[in-house]
């Protein structure tokens, strides 16, 4: 049987970021007896017109893809120009490596507006995936556009996306078998009820709500653990004089992420701009963790959490839910069981991959 040739393309594509890991996981999980997978990526490059710094290539993600039979093809970009609407790549040799005629299908992961170099890829069928909200286009050779939540799809359609091309598939998050190792004994937290969250070091997405709520309910019997987080989280914890709050360095090592999750009783989410489809929330659900979050401009977290917890309006309501989780055992157990069920029925990576494989097969049929 002739293999389906598929190209993945991503600026900074071997970084340890959400969209990057999304594409890396899909590329890695495709059965290599049916698919020939090339992944085009570059290292991070400075932005013109913005002080944003894109995460750079992570050696562990390179090794991850190689170990799963993905052919990595590295190109170069000197700058990314955000002064242009299409965010052009400046001084790139991408076209020396890539020719769309060599592929049956192309998989993208991007923001949603017309972007370089995809504006110049006009023949080969594309499976697009959009990772921000409120932007959309109807490109003729896009076969389907994958959105990651109902809310995001609605905004994408309103911005010009073709509703007949839009499909919803959650983020594929790899959750390998993990042991019960945790930080509980190491931190002396055997008798504590532990809240926690996992977030990248980015002050632009910082929300004060989780720690503000924790300040209301903290005691000698509670703790809060943050994997990653920004300097704002650390400053808030210090300024409030919070008890039993600890921070772990950001990591891409899967065992350490699950060691962190094994330490928690409740996943206490908070992000100023909200979510589309959070990998961190999915990881929490895979550990059967009850969830708390708050309202924000994007509300994908509401769709993800469902009956595994609650999304509240502010820190006072957030604090009340924290108290309920601690003191109402029946409520806690109900949320815990629902978290496990949601993960198995909606977010398990094998069921998500079946949907992507079906899309690719449709393209070439």
Predicted feature locations:
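Conserved donor-binding/catalytic core segment of Leloir-type glycosyltransferases
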Residues: 5-7, 177, 183-205, 211-214
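Glycosyltransferase donor-sugar binding loop
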Residues: 39-46, 200, 223-235, 250
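Donor nucleotide-sugar binding/catalytic pocket of nucleotide-sugar-dependent glycosyltransferases
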Residues: 133-135, 142-178
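Nucleotide-activated donor-binding/catalytic signature segment of Leloir-type glycosyltransferases, i.e.
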Residues: 234-252
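Short alpha-helical segment that forms part of, or immediately flanks, the ligand-binding pocket
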Residues: 258, 281-286, 300-302
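A charged, aromatic-enriched C-terminal amphipathic alpha-helix characteristic of glycosyltransferases
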Residues: 330-361
């Amino acid at each position: 049987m002739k293999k389906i040739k598929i190209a993945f393309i991503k600026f900074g594509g071997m970084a340890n970021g959400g969209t990057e890991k999304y594409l890396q996981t899909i590329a890695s999980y495709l059965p290599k007896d049916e698919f020939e997978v090339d992944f085009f990526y570059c290292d991070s490059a400075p932005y013109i017109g913005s002080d944003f710094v894109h995460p750079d290539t992570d050696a562990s993600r390179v090794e991850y893809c190689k170990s799963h039979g993905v052919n990595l093809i590295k190109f170069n970009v000197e700058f990314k120009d955000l002064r242009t609407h299409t965010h052009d790549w400046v001084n790139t040799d991408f076209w020396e490596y890539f020719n769309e005629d060599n592929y049956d299908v192309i998989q993208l992961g991007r923001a949603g507006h017309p972007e370089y170099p995809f504006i110049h890829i006009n023949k080969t069928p594309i499976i697009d995936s959009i990772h921000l909200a409120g932007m959309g286009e109807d490109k003729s050779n896009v076969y389907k556009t994958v959105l990651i939540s109902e809310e995001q799809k609605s905004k994408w359609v309103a911005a010009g996306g073709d509703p007949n091309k839009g499909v919803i598939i959650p983020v594929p998050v790899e959750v390998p078998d993990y042991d019960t190792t945790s930080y509980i004994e190491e931190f002396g937290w055997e008798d504590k009820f532990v809240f926690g969250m996992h977030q990248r070091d980015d002050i632009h997405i910082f929300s004060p709500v989780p720690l503000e709520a924790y300040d209301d309910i903290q005691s000698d019997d509670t703790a809060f653990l943050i994997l990653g987080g920004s300097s704002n989280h650390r400053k808030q914890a210090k300024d409030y004089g919070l008890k039993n709050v600890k921070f772990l360095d950001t990591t891409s090592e899967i065992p350490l992420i699950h060691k962190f999750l094994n330490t928690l009783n409740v996943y206490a989410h908070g992000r100023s701009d909200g979510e589309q489809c959070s990998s961190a929330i999915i990881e929490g659900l895979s550990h059967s963790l009850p969830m708390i979050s708050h309202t924000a401009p994007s509300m994908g977290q509401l769709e993800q959490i469902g009956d595994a917890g609650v999304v509240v309006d502010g820190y006072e309501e957030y604090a009340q839910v924290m108290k309920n989780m601690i003191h109402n055992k029946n409520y806690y157990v109900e949320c815990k069981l629902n978290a496990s069920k949601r993960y198995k029925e909606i977010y398990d990576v094998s069921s998500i991959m079946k949907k992507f494989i079906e899309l690719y097969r449709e393209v070439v049929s």
